[in-house]
């Protein structure tokens, strides 16, 4: 078994590196050392994950539990730990300092003869797994005892990274791209084969183990599996949609529904539903399960679609209404009656044991139409999105206007020959929406309001995502456009995500919450680490359906800025 010490040493070395190539080499060295049985765990650990994102498993450990566990392991009061965190700004550095001090004060004659067994990667995972499965009465005690065991069994350096792993934030800048390249380097396999294997498995841990076991041959045997969701293909906004249509000559036009993305897995009579964030939302949407059982005729299939909240006439309701259904845990049947859903299928990735993602869109479309059975009477609850193949710009505009009139967001413009690229955003799927500049940004800081809003968090520092460094880069503050109810909701959410101390009245927030923000323009600015600032930002809505890593990137910020200059 591989020691957790080696993992911690790798993390420490990477923290001191700024070069992506050097970071990749360090990760590759670690992957080569780790036993194949432990490789899935080590791979997820180095990406700040305890469990694969698709698994739905939640560690369920917050800062309060960490403070209690550290207190029990060290003898330091919780109040003192909280004070130290405010000074260091990081729970990992705090754990390091606390356990260093404890070790210094615990040197006894007997300690020279005591040899503690070395903590392994497997044991750290096992303890996290026990903590994650604890529920009901006494579950908090179980979590604390297992964390306490890890802290008392670890060195100060190991405790630093155990603490960060417990919050799934290693802060070493290792993301999917680095790990993909590290797997290729460690096991001498082409990066493009690693990438394709990741697309069909959505699990770099599985990919790493296969590459170590059997190289290219083992990777090529990996495929899509029912109930292991794959990332959804993404679209991008085009600065000149007409030019893109002319370049493609012919495009597939579909309505862009204002709903929530859903990935549907059917295996016989069993149906599982996953959200855009790949969370299992099956229990919240029993009506969709019945729709799929009734209308999807394949024995096994994975389909892509959009769930839209509708009224009694089938007219789309506000986006927030569908999110109420996705969040629902209690009184699910009653809520289904109050907020009916229309399920609109637009793609299929797998059918009856055959993977379809490498087929052109038009071939996948034929498979989709043969798989889903519906009628005019069923149209309020299910449909296959109507698709028109054309190169006529006037017809595209006509369909676009019809979509807006029907209450939808606009249209999707797709390359008819495009493959389905999980997790990828590019020119094969474009969206045409009404012109209003908005960005999806992550809250990384906040400050309390004033006057009657003094007990509410009233202003939010927002950031874009840098996929190269896995960092969030600030682009401004937003405090307008929110109702009192929205302020209360965000205050409740963010209260559990505060970390570190206040600096100039602003306190840090763990990057978990995505907001859609409208703005007038983007300006160059030395005040934020992105180098840009939003002018007149305004809150539009919370994007519960998006992970922080799905926020708009620093590259998109730069493109929007450049496009503004061209319009001057």
UniProtKB/Swiss-Prot annotation:
Coiled coil: none
Cofactor: Mg(2+)
Active site per UniProt: 256 (n6-amp-lysine intermediate)
Entry superkingdom: Archaea
CDD domains: Adenylation_DNA_ligase_Arch_LigB, OBF_DNA_ligase_Arch_LigB
Biological process according to GO: cell division; DNA biosynthetic process; DNA recombination; DNA repair; lagging strand elongation
Catalysed reaction equations from the record: ATP + (deoxyribonucleotide)n-3'-hydroxyl + 5'-phospho-(deoxyribonucleotide)m = (deoxyribonucleotide)n+m + AMP + diphosphate
GO molecular-function terms, A-Z: ATP binding; DNA binding; DNA ligase (ATP) activity; metal ion binding
ATP-binding as UniProt keyword: yes
EC number: 6.5.1.1
InterPro entries: ATP-dep_DNA_ligase (IPR050191), DNA_ligae_ATP-dep_bac/arc (IPR022865), DNA_ligase_ATP-dep (IPR000977), DNA_ligase_ATP-dep_C (IPR012309), DNA_ligase_ATP-dep_cent (IPR012310), DNA_ligase_ATP-dep_CS (IPR016059), DNA_ligase_ATP-dep_N (IPR012308), DNA_ligase_N_sf (IPR036599)
Gene3D superfamilies according to UniProt: DNA ligase, ATP-dependent, N-terminal domain, DNA ligase/mRNA capping enzyme, Nucleic acid-binding proteins
Function field: DNA ligase that seals nicks in double-stranded DNA during DNA replication, DNA recombination and DNA repair.
NCBIfam families: dnl1
HAMAP family: DNA_ligase
Protein's name according to its UniProt entry: DNA ligase 2
